[in-house]
Swiss-Prot record:
Residues 182-195 form the CRIB domain. InterPro entries: BACURD1-3 (IPR045068), BTB/POZ_dom (IPR000210), CRIB_dom (IPR000095), CRIB_dom_sf (IPR036936), SKP1/BTB/POZ_sf (IPR011333), T1-type_BTB (IPR003131). This is Uncharacterized protein T23G5.3. Residues 5-107 form the BTB domain. Disulfide bonds: none annotated. The lineage of its organism: Eukaryota, Metazoa, Ecdysozoa, Nematoda, Chromadorea. It comes from the Eukaryota. It comes from Caenorhabditis elegans. PROSITE patterns: CRIB.
Length: 262
C-alpha cells in the first residue's frame, strides 16, 4: 500500500510538511476548498505551497486538524486571540468555537470577532433584564461632562523664542494671555500649542521642523500687540487633520515669508 501523499507548505518563510489527508480532515475549511482546485499549479519550483499567514500560530492549526478537539490550547488571552484570527481565516469552525468558549469562560477579555453558536449548547435560564421606568425614558439625558483642563506645559518640553517687547504707553493695552489657558477642542488630538507666555513664544519641541508651526511662530513674532495664541490640532490621523489658528485680539500679521496671517 503506497504511503499517503504529503505536501510541503511555506508559511511566511517557515516550512511545514504534512499529509494532505490531515489538511482535509474537516469539511468546509480553506484547505478542502483549496484541494478542489488545480492547487499543483500554485507550487513553487521547490514543490512548496506558499501560504501568507502567521507562521508562529500555524503549528496549532496543524495540530487541531490532526487531533481535532483533543488538541490543547494555550491559556494566554493574547495567544488565543491570534489563533482565533487564523481559525476564522482558515474557516475551521470547531477550533473557532473552542477558542471563543475558552475566552468567554476563563479569560477576562471578550472575543474580538463575532461569536458563533457552539453546537449542543442549550440556554437553560433567561437573562434578568431590568425594567426601566417610563419617566426615566422620557426624561432628558444628563448634560455631558465639562472638557478636561489642558495639561501643564513642562519647561523641558517647550522652546522659547525671544520676541519684541510690547509697546509701553498710556494708551497701550497690557493683555497677558497664557498659553496654558487655551482649552483644547473636543475629539481632537493636540499636536502643538503655540502661544505667548508674556515674554516669548512657547511651542512643542517635536513640531519645530513642521512648516505650519514655523509659519505660526514667525507670524506671532511679527505681531505688534504680541497677544496671539495658536493651537495646532488634528483628527482621525491624516483624514481630517488640519491646523486651527486662534487670534485673541484682531489685527493683521505678516509672516516672514510675506504670507498674510489673520
Amino acid at each position: 500500500m503506497p504511503p499517503p501523499p504529503l505536501i510541503s507548505l511555506d508559511v511566511e518563510g517557515v516550512y511545514f510538511k504534512t499529509r494532505i489527508a490531515t489538511l482535509k480532515s474537516i469539511e468546509g475549511t480553506y484547505f478542502t476548498k483549496l484541494f478542489e482546485t488545480n492547487w499543483r499549479e500554485q507550487l513553487d519550483r521547490d514543490g512548496r505551497l506558499f501560504i501568507d499567514r502567521d507562521s508562529s500560530v500555524f503549528p496549532v492549526i496543524l495540530n487541531f486538524l490532526r487531533d481535532h478537539e483533543k488538541c490543547s490550547l494555550p491559556k494566554d488571552e493574547y495567544q488565543l486571540m491570534r489563533i482565533l484570527r487564523e481559525a476564522v481565516f482558515f474557516k475551521i469552525g470547531p477550533l473557532r468555537n473552542m477558542i471563543e468558549h475558552k475566552l468567554r469562560t476563563f479569560c477576562t477579555c471578550p472575543p474580538e470577532l463575532p461569536s458563533t453558536p457552539i453546537p449542543n449548547q442549550i440556554l437553560t435560564q433567561k437573562e434578568n433584564v431590568p425594567i426601566v421606568p417610563r419617566n426615566l425614558l422620557l426624561s432628558k439625558p444628563p448634560p455631558p461632562p465639562p472638557p478636561p483642563l489642558p495639561s501643564l506645559m513642562q519647561p523641558k518640553d517647550t522652546v522659547q523664542i525671544p520676541m519684541r517687547k510690547p509697546p509701553t504707553g498710556r494708551n497701550s493695552k497690557k493683555i497677558k494671555t497664557s498659553a496654558d489657558s487655551i482649552s483644547l477642542p473636543r475629539n481632537f488630538t493636540h499636536i502643538a500649542h503655540v502661544g505667548w507666555n508674556g515674554a516669548s513664544v512657547l511651542f512643542d519641541k517635536k513640531m519645530t521642523d513642521d512648516p505650519t508651526v514655523r509659519k505660526i511662530c514667525d507670524a506671532a513674532a511679527e505681531a505688534v500687540d504680541l497677544s496671539a495664541v495658536y493651537n495646532v490640532v488634528n483628527k482621525n490621523a491624516d483624514e481630517e487633520s488640519h491646523s486651527v489658528e486662534v487670534l485673541i485680539t484682531g489685527g493683521l500679521m505678516q509672516s516672514r515669508d510675506g504670507t498674510s496671517r489673520h
